[in-house]
């Protein structure tokens, strides 16, 4: 049961990365366009704002497509089925909800009582994915043969969406009310506590690759903002981009991603044994620059996560504290994907107290460096370069990586599902005991996570390319 649950949660987390991947361009367009910079012609600002806003307005549909593709090995039919399912489900609720709630349709629409948001998109995507996996090989009588196989999937998905829409018309209002209550509490009533908890739990979920699921309600659901054109935005990211002065509560990520973790990487480098310091320095400086520029932190985190869990617990606590600090000091900036220098500069149009970020950030860096340096020495933690015995990894060329990786995962017969997100290979295997974790690390994995039949190998931003190479190798050999 646990094996299947973790494998499915892995797929959910991975599938959410496709819609999240459109946020950078949408965020830049909406953020820059809404900022109304004096050096940018008004018509250009308007076009950019409308273009970016259109993506955020259709996020439920984009999430529906992403979830469907994530559970069907990127089969395009499931994406079409997800679009059909979402459209039918929404319209079904629009008709049935007024009958259930005994309220005019206009009042239901104005109060968003039947608005399922991105969660509705995820539900629609799940319907399409389930129907695809269940019916894509279905055989029908000869006179209905045209609708057999994959063509049947959008049809059955649409029918299932009608049933789902009717059911949601009854159960969604109380669920939506609870979500709205939490949204109001987190966004407006007590954001200090809410985002402190968010930051801590989000880091705790990183080792399992499940943080993408936790991010969705905070990034795309909480709070509500209506701009001058009457467009409604939900979620901290879209609201900030649209110019909501109460948004930007996710800004704490800049403190530990641009300053804290890079300082921790330097502390690990300085703590390495003299004979290993040059080698470790190259790795850590590269990881620190990645975190500082892009906000991608896994290369640093996985270097100490398993060998020194006490450091990771402290890091999770400091990450959680970063969000309340920014909120209490009135520091706001925007993020579209992660909290790196690129986001910090490009999305600063609606920011507040931008000058405080480097000041507080340097203070955070000092805290991180001091804690890591002291604890590594005092507890003799085996961070990179301090191992009792090290074995040099053999350099492996790009052309050799695919077969070596397949072999490390136990051979192609042992691989039951192959996928990747931004920083990690996500592989389901038949027999975990056949996976060579040491071999994966020699090939460059910053860490390996095993839970049930799911194996995650953290290779950084090249993971998706490695997945493509492995997929081609498996098909051709």
UniProtKB/Swiss-Prot annotation:
Q: What's the domain remark here?
A: The EIIB domain is phosphorylated by phospho-EIIA on a cysteinyl or histidyl residue, depending on the transported sugar. Then, it transfers the phosphoryl group to the sugar substrate concomitantly with the sugar uptake processed by the EIIC domain. The EIIC domain forms the PTS system translocation channel and contains the specific substrate-binding site.
Q: Where is the PTS EIIB type-1 domain?
A: 399-477
> Active-site positions, per UniProt?
421 (phosphocysteine intermediate)
Domain (PTS EIIC type-1) spans 1-388
- What is the recorded name of this protein? PTS system glucose-specific EIICB component
Effect recorded for residue 424 to A/H: Cannot bind Mlc. Destroys the ability of Cys-421 to be phosphorylated in vitro
User: What is the protein's species of origin?
Assistant: Escherichia coli (strain K12)
Catalysed reaction equations from the record = N(pros)-phospho-L-histidyl-[protein] + D-glucose(out) = D-glucose 6-phosphate(in) + L-histidyl-[protein]
Consequence recorded when altering residue 419 to A = Still allows binding to Mlc
Residues on the membrane's Periplasmic side span: 36-50, 101-111, 173-190, 271-279, 331-355
Q: Where in the cell is it found?
A: Cell inner membrane
Task: Enumerate the Cytoplasmic topological stretches.
Answer: 1-14, 72-79, 133-151, 212-249, 301-309, 377-477
Result after altering residue 204 to S: Destabilizes the protein structure
Briefly, what is this protein's role? The phosphoenolpyruvate-dependent sugar phosphotransferase system (sugar PTS), a major carbohydrate active transport system, catalyzes the phosphorylation of incoming sugar substrates concomitantly with their translocation across the cell membrane. The enzyme II complex composed of PtsG and Crr is involved in glucose transport. Also functions as a chemoreceptor monitoring the environment for changes in sugar concentration and an effector modulating the activity of the transcriptional repressor Mlc. (Microbial infection) Probably transports the toxic C-terminal region of CdiA from E.coli strains NC101 and 3006 across the inner membrane to the cytoplasm, where CdiA degrades specific tRNAs. Toxin transport is strain-specific, mutations in this gene do not confer resistance to several other tested CdiA toxins. Probably also serves as the inner membrane receptor for CdiA-STECO31 from E.coli strain STEC_O31.
**Molecular function per GO:** D-glucose transmembrane transporter activity; kinase activity; protein-N(PI)-phosphohistidine-sugar phosphotransferase activity; protein-phosphocysteine-glucose phosphotransferase system transporter activity
Q: Which Gene3D superfamilies does its entry note?
A: Glucose permease domain IIB
> Which keywords does UniProt give here?
Cell inner membrane, Cell membrane, Kinase, Membrane, Phosphoprotein, Phosphotransferase system, Sugar transport, Transferase, Transmembrane, Transmembrane helix, Transport
Under what conditions is it induced? Answer: Induced by glucose. Expression is positively regulated by the cAMP-CRP complex and negatively regulated by the Mlc transcriptional repressor. Mlc and CRP-cAMP bind independently to the ptsG promoter region, and the action of Mlc is dominant over the cAMP-CRP action. The ptsG transcript is degraded under conditions of glucose-phosphate stress (due to intracellular accumulation of glucose-6-phosphate caused by disruption of glycolytic flux), or in the presence of (toxic) non-metabolizable glucose phosphate analogs due to hybridization with the small RNA sgrS (originally known as ryaA).
Concerning InterPro entries, the annotation shows: Glu_permease_IIB (IPR036878), PTrfase_EIIB_Cys (IPR018113), PTS_EIIC (IPR003352), PTS_EIIC_1 (IPR013013), PTS_Glucose_EIICBA (IPR050429), PTS_IIB_1 (IPR001996), PTS_IIBC_glc (IPR011299), PTS_maltose/Glc_sub_IIC (IPR004719)
GO cellular component annotations of the record: membrane; plasma membrane; transmembrane transporter complex
Which sequence ranges are marked TM in the entry? 15-35, 51-71, 80-100, 112-132, 152-172, 191-211, 250-270, 280-300, 310-330, 356-376
Modified-residue entries (Phosphocysteine), positions: 421
Alphabetical GO biological process terms: D-glucose import across plasma membrane; D-glucose transmembrane transport; phosphoenolpyruvate-dependent sugar phosphotransferase system; regulation of DNA-templated transcription
Q: How does it assemble?
A: Homodimer. The dephosphorylated form interacts with the Mlc transcriptional repressor. Mlc and the EIIB domain form a complex with the 1:1 stoichiometry.
Q: Which domain of life is it from?
A: Bacteria
Summarize what gene deletion causes. Answer: Disruption confers resistance to cellular contact-dependent growth inhibition (CDI) CdiA of E.coli strains NC101 and 3006, but not to several other tested CdiA toxins. Disruption confers resistance to cellular contact-dependent growth inhibition (CDI) CdiA-STECO31 of E.coli strain STEC_O31.
Q: How does it sit in the membrane?
A: Multi-pass membrane protein
